[in-house]
């Protein structure tokens, strides 16, 4: 069961909360009529236990059990610093 854990990579937008970060996940979707690829952004709250992230960092997050009303993702690693 633990081999199906979803992981995503995104950019940190905010680290103003204690032990929490806001991560922007970008994906490309194709317009149904015109075929142009458009960028769509999803904002996800993730748990950052050591408060090690800063705004602009590229991070990897993974899905976990719900930690609060809006947090169900946790930080795995900081890929690159801002």
From Swiss-Prot:
Top-level taxon in the UniProt lineage: Bacteria
GO molecular function: rRNA binding; structural constituent of ribosome
PROSITE patterns: RIBOSOMAL_S17
Signal peptide positions on this chain: none
GO cellular component terms given for this protein: cytosolic small ribosomal subunit
Subunit structure: Part of the 30S ribosomal subunit.
Protein name: Small ribosomal subunit protein uS17
Organism: Shewanella piezotolerans (strain WP3 / JCM 13877)
């Amino acid at each position: 069961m633990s081999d199906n854990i979803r992981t995503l990579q995104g950019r940190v937008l905010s680290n103003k909360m204690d032990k929490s970060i806001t991560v922007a996940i970008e994906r490309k979707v194709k317009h149904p009529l015109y075929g142009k690829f458009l960028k769509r952004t999803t904002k996800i709250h993730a748990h950052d236990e050591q408060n090690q992230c800063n705004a602009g960092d590229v991070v990897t997050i993974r899905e976990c059990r719900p930690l609060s009303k809006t947090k169900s993702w946790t930080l795995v690693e900081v890929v690159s610093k801002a």
